[in-house]
Amino acid sequence: MVDTESPICPLSPLEADDLESPLSEEFLQEMGNIQEISQSIGEDSSGSFSFTEYQYLGSGPGSDGSVITDTLSPAPSPSSVTHPAAPGGAEEPSSVALNIECRICGDRASGYHYGVHACEGCKGFFRRTIRLKLAYDKCDRSCKIQKKNRNKCQYCRFHKCLSVGMSHNAIRFGRMPRSEKAKLKAEILTCEQDPEDAETADLKSLAKRIYEAYLKNFNMNKVKARVILAGKASNNPPFVIHDMETLCMAEKTLVAKLVANGIQNKEAEVRIFHCCQCTSVETVTELTEFAKSIPGFANLDLNDQVTLLKYGVYEAIFAMLSSVMNKDGMLVAYGNGFITREFLKSLRKPFCDIMEPKFDFAMKFNALELDDSDISLFVAAIICCGDRPGLLNVGHIEKMQEGIVHVLKLHLQTNHPDNIFLFPKLLQKMADLRQLVTEHAQLVQVIKKTESDAALHPLLQEIYRDMY
């Protein structure tokens, strides 16, 4: 029989057990002639076999000790032997070394032997065992085979050879196919890749997933809003609401459905407050669907999901509201209308106090120049906040938030490399939003007590209950 090998590096010196063994001569000899193993030959990358393409190394012409070698790159050949050019161009320089470990003992592999990458020592050990049909004393200790102790337990060493896939039937002639060589190099590069690179890839994947969920679940985003506010939209510009007359016109067209069922007969402030609630309810629904797309959220206890949304939705709403605001006003009715800041300030108390704090926050928030990918992670971090009152699985939720905040930090470093203070500024905005929501909830309670016509939507009433 003949062993076929594909050297990866220069052959290592013979082991002590090979030199001292009466089988050392066999270590250098072939295990039969070529014809005896013709049935075991695997096809090379070209799918055909030609003896003239391979190099024979032995003690001389006619020697029984010829060794057929499968190289990763062209090996020096005797002048009497010629080799046709490999299909597809010349082989790579011999200096290219694939630093692969022996699958049996972990030493440096010298080539592809008997179906696996193995060192010279383990290759020779397996060859002798197979050829001479050696039987070793059984060992039940499952010895760990390493370079330093591989000669101690022959039974376990042979068992390891078999377990990793060494087989006499895996003998192969010729050079390693280019496709297999390329695959090996790719595997090596993957194994040698910095663990931090793999972690970064996972974090980028998480950021992408959250961003895509954000774009999918929200009707309005910053990109759309900025196009409209800049007057670059392809359709008609938004209808501007700047006084009572234009408000009435908008109510007959843009928000006709919202002011039906008797609402149209109430005063302007109550009608505006009602429309604001309708928009908030719709956004809460969108936020709920978005939250389900955050990895791990849907697996939380249902009570924890409700608690996170109860305390997080308004912070998220006011963060996203900044996208549709500028210093002069804000988009309404899906971007089809624009209500001026001055008109909202002209409403009677306490309604005139509802939106002005949101404009103040929005101007500072917009100054950070975040895009939708940044905002999506920011909103996800707001929702998955582990310090909300009444949570059951605090530790798990805190871990979720830590992961999202870490992704947010890395994303900001990539997306805004010149703004090193953006991340801490954004964390401060989380605290600012809590204060903003607290003040808003208090104002809503005042309206609830003093304005009999300004009824609260049941869903929002449940959110406000026991909030602060």
UniProtKB/Swiss-Prot annotation:
Annotated localization: Nucleus
Q: Where is this region: Disordered?
A: 1-20, 65-92
The record's principal subcellular location, in a coarse class, is: nucleus
Quote the cellular component terms of the Gene Ontology held in the record: nucleus
Site (Essential for heterodimerization with RXRA) found at: L433
The keyword Protein transport is assigned to this record: no
Name the residue ranges with Polar residues bias.
66-82
Task: Cite a single GO BP annotation.
Answer: negative regulation of appetite
Q: Which UniProt keywords apply?
A: Activator, Biological rhythms, DNA-binding, Lipid-binding, Metal-binding, Nucleus, Receptor, Transcription, Transcription regulation, Ubl conjugation, Zinc, Zinc-finger
**Assembly notes:** Heterodimer; with RXRA. This heterodimerization is required for DNA binding and transactivation activity. Interacts with NCOA3 coactivator. Interacts with CITED2; the interaction stimulates its transcriptional activity. Also interacts with PPARBP in vitro. Interacts with AKAP13, LPIN1, PRDM16 and coactivator NCOA6. Interacts with ASXL1 and ASXL2. Interacts with PER2. Interacts with SIRT1; the interaction seems to be modulated by NAD(+) levels. Interacts with CRY1 and CRY2.
Listed name of the protein:
Peroxisome proliferator-activated receptor alpha
Native species of this protein?
Canis lupus familiaris (Dog)
